[in-house]
Each structure stands twice: as C-alpha cells, then as structure tokens.
Amino acid sequence: MSGIMKSSLFFTKKVGSYSDGWGEVTGEDRTWEQSYRDRWAHDKIVRSTHGVNCTGSCSWQVYVKDGIVVWETQETDYPPTPAGVPNHEPRGCPRGASYSWYLYSASRVKHPLIRAELKAAWEDARKTMKPIEAWASIVENPQLRKSYTAARGLGGMVRTTWDEALEIIASANLYTIKKYGPDRISGFSPIPGYSMVSYGAGTRYLSLIGGALLSFYDWYCDLPPSSPQTWGEQTDVPESEAWYYSSYIIVWGTNISMTRSPDAHFLTEARYNGTKVVNVCPDYCEVTKDADWWIHPKQATDAALAMAVSHVIFKEFHYEHPDPYFTEYCRKLTDFPILVTMEPRADGRYTAGRTVRACDLGYKEPECNNPEWKTVVWDELSKAPAVAQGSMGYRWGQKEGQDLGKWNLHEVDGETGKAIKPQLTFLNDSDAVIDVEYPYFGGRERDGFPNNAMASDVMVRRVPAKRVQLNGQDVYVATVFDLFGSYLGVDRGLGGECAKSYADNIPFTPAWQEKITGVEAQYAITLAREFATAASKTQGRACVLMGAGVNQWFQTDNTYRSIINILLMCGTCGVPGGGWCHYVGQEKIRPEAGWSEYSFAKDWEPASRHMNSTSYFYEHTDQWRYERIPLSDMLSPLANTKVFDGTYVDYNIQSELMGWLPSAPQLNVNPTKIAAAAKAAASSRNNS
C-alpha cells in the first residue's frame, strides 16, 4: 500500500495507549520526511562570500551537492573583539542568504551574446580571411560597420560560442594596437572590493598589452572628493566596530540599516550602550527607526545645516568658552594655525590668497628641501613665523640628515629644530583688523531656494591680521582659524557685518539655515551643542556616518567638507569612536602589495596606463553637451570673469593637459611606431 493510501486510513493508526487511556500511540508514515532530507543534503561545504555588487565580504558556508549550490548559512568564526565589545558576527543579510537563487536565475547571462549583424559579417569574412584581416575588413567597410553599430540599443543579440567570442575580441584588440596603438584600448574591470582576482584579471590583461585602465571608485561617485581635498588621502575611515566606542553618532545621508546590513548591529548595540543616535535625512528611511532623533532638511540643503552647526560650535566652544581639548587638537592636528596671505583689492579690502610657504621666508633649494611645499605658522614662543613639520614638503623627497623623519606633527620648526607653539588666532595681538571679502553663492534667488536671497554676492568680514615681510615685501597674513571664524559670521567684537545672535538672518546662522533647510533654528543649535558637548567630555568620541545620500549629489565636496569642519573643530578625527565614517562601496583590500603586483602586471612592467573614468565618460559620451548650469553660476563673484569664460569640459581637458588628472592616451600617434619614426628621422639627418 502506498504512503498516500496509508495516511488516509485513520482508524488503523492506533497501536497502543498510555495514561489510563487518556493518551494513545499511533503508527504514522514518515517516508515523506526523506524529501526534506534530500533537499538539504550536500556533498561538501565551501567557505565563500557574495562579491557581486556587494563589498560586505561576509563569510558564508556554501553547501554544494553534485556541483550545485543548494543553500548557504552564515559563518561564525570571526576573530573576537575586545572584552565588552559586541562581536562582528552575525554578518550577512537576506540578500546573501538567497544568493544561490541568483546563480541559477533565468535572467542571468550564462553564455556570450553578439549582435546578429556582426556575427553574420564575421562568419562571412572568416571563410576567406585570417582573424585580424577579417576584423579589418569589417571595421574598414563603412556599410558593414554601420550594419551592427546602427543596431545598438535595439536588441537583436544572439548566442555565440566562447571560442568565437574570444577570437573576435583578440582580433579587434590586435587590429587596434597595430593601427592606432595599445593606448587606444581602454577597459573597466569590476572593483577589487567585490573580487580582487576578478578585478586583477581584467587589469592585468590591459596592463600587459599596454591598454588604459579606467578607474572605478570615482566614476560612480563612491569616492568622496572631500577626502583628498582635506587630507590628501583617499577615504581613510574606521571600520564599523568603532561605532560602539562613540558617545554620539550622527547618521547623515546614509541608510546604514539597509545598505550596510552586516554592520548595522553595531549601531543598534551602541544605542543600547547609551550612545545617542541622530538621523539627518530628508526621508523616513530605515535607519530612522534605529535613531533617537530624526532631523529632515530639504534635499540638497545639508551644507546649510552643517554650516549653522559650525557657527554655533565655533561661537560657543572656540570663542566664548574655549574648550581646552578642542583648542589643543585644532592647534596641533589641523590647518587652523597655518598662515594665509591677504591679497589687496582695488576697493581697499582684501581676499584670502594662498598659504604662506617656506620659500616666502627666504628658504631655497638645495639648503631647504621642497620649500614651496612647506607651510608656515605663527610661533607663540618666538613671536615670529615658523616652518612647522608635517606639511607635504616633508613627506616627499626626504633626504638623509635633512628632512628624514620630519614628516610628523611634533611641535618643532623643521628648518631650525627649535621648539614651537603654533598660534591659532591673532584676535588679541593683531597688527591690524582688515576687511576681507568672501564669495557668497546664495546671493541670488534660485529654484528651490526662494528665501535664500541676500543683499550681495560678496560678504565682507573683519579679520585680525599680522604684518610680516615675505620675499622682501610687507604683507598682511591671517590664520585659517581667524578666516574661518569670520567667514561663519561669528561676532568676536571686531565690528562689521556679523551675527549678534542666532536669530539674525546672516549667512550661516541657525536662523539663516532654517529658511533654506526647513529645520528649526533651535534644532540646529541643540544638535551643535549636544555633539560638541559629547565630544568634549569623551575627548573626541563622537562621529558622523556619511554615505551615498550626500556623496552622490551635486556639490558633494562642499557638503562633505562642511560636515568635516564640525568633526575637526570637535577634535574627533583619529579618535576611536570619533571622526568621519564614509561608507559607499569599498576601495580598500588587505593584501595590497601582492595584489597590485598581480593586477597591474608589475612583474612585467613598472607602471600601467591609467585614465579617470569620470572624465572618460563625461567627454566620450558627450555628457558635457547636456550641462544645464552655466559656468558663470559656479564662478566666484571675486574671480576674473575674463579668465574663466569657457565651459566645464574646457577646464576638465585643461586639467588633463597639466597632469592634474590621470589621462590616457597622451599622444596623438601610435606609440609602437615612435621608435621606428625616430630612427628614420635620425637616419635622414645623418644622410643629409
């Protein structure tokens, strides 16, 4: 009798009883359970991760049966964290737990596809020609070439074999190298944060043939340009365990609970530990439920809120009641003490120029190494300019007995060896108080910001300055700290245009930002006070989690830097549980030395060709033709409009020509033919 028939025989199941007949023992058929055992049976367990479009790098146990992935579970053998700190596990998410479904999805491309028109042309050409000749006959025939290029975007892809696909690719590459040069071949390889080996396979191939490697981190706006602008380094941020050490966390423009699922538990655990969590985001996103306070500015107005927070912190924690920890941090570890030249204008006012450098004090090569790259501070001890260690000039080109070991922040004059104490402000010992002009880009009403109009495109602020002699001329200089405070409109008793109270509608006050962001002025004041107070009491253990919500928006560099200003004023960067925490993508990998040797073919050649993808696609896909914001809107009202009268693409190309942006190709000829041309030219000169 079958199992199905047996299950229908209700009265024959009883085989006994117990508890004086109150309970009975039945005979049930359990063969159906085998189907479940077969479903979860496996031959082996493989450790892996889910590297496609995810940089979480979570460790998973992948169960394999007959070569097929049948299911997966999270691994739990991560190294333990310090005592009292939650462990990293469980790491994983529902997307990872169902990843085997992606592998065998009907929508996944599992074989090469080619346009039907190109396949027909190729097969016809290969009947009589070798591979490279066949490709040349197609691309050099206008009608044949148009037959498949005109079909782009219209579908019509058909299946081909791997052998045919590889032959076409190799033939096209060899043809291009022979006729135009290897630097005319460019390629993009998936980011190493997904799979180091997969990325390296593509870049190694391009490096070996002399092609141009397209960048990844900057192209899709995962790279925060504010980081190299501020520190000269690319996204050096803490890992998620550090959140637990924080006393105050602002989640600003990143949806941690959704986009960083493996790390999100640290945020919740930190909150249980007493950390206050504030979410700054226009929409009620997932992370809002994990926060204590939701602040929702209008989209694209984050910088205004951040500047108002900076205004409050500078006024209360740096001017009215200077916090000792903040003062020492800013003096030793930021650019606040660095001197800036004040450039006179025709109207008798000044603008901030460049930083004062060692070369301005008379230091020259070879006695002084890199004098144009060493910044200058004002020394409180000697009451004179000093060349503080730690600037870029001390990092590059160190020489034995000269700059060796001086790339640090010890309070020493790098050129004289004397102890120094960089001075933050000239407020109490200035030689003069000068009027400084700053550009104000909110001086005109714009769509979406109807209440942002002020009286002028130029702000005039009073700044304390010192008169020093640079290159034989008397020049006014000011510290970055004094310039920043005046720019924020903080009233420091110098008179002029500044905010007497937070209610004044002057740029960067809480009242000013309220008209732009929609966030109540009192909220901005409270946020500033709470964050700074937490940072003060914990010596910098307060942080801001940032991400794509802000970074992938127009003017991201300015928005990010307005937030970074808050972090630096509160002495948080470099402190466990403090600083800026940018989480978009993943540009770092652990075995970088060996990986780069493999990926960029350094075992064959010392350097590869690189091209920044942002410029590449902006120019070659004609995106520059669709700019809707004229360059004049981006230009400072203090700038010379006659000098800057082009378009965005003009200045992008100019940056490439000057070497500010990596670019390839760099020559207008085939580089493989340069040597032969040079020999021919030399031979002709010798014969003549």
Model-derived features: where do they sit?
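Active-site lining segments that contact anionic ligands and/or coordinate catalytic metals
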Residues: S57-S59, T275, Q539-A542, N687
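Short coil/turn segments at secondary-structure boundaries
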Residues: Y180-P190, D218-Y220, H321-Y329, G496-K500, ...
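Amphipathic, charged-and-aliphatic alpha-helical interface segments
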Residues: G489-A499, A503
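A glycine-rich, hydrophobic/aromatic-adjacent loop/helix-cap motif
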Residues: R492, N505, A511, Y523, ...
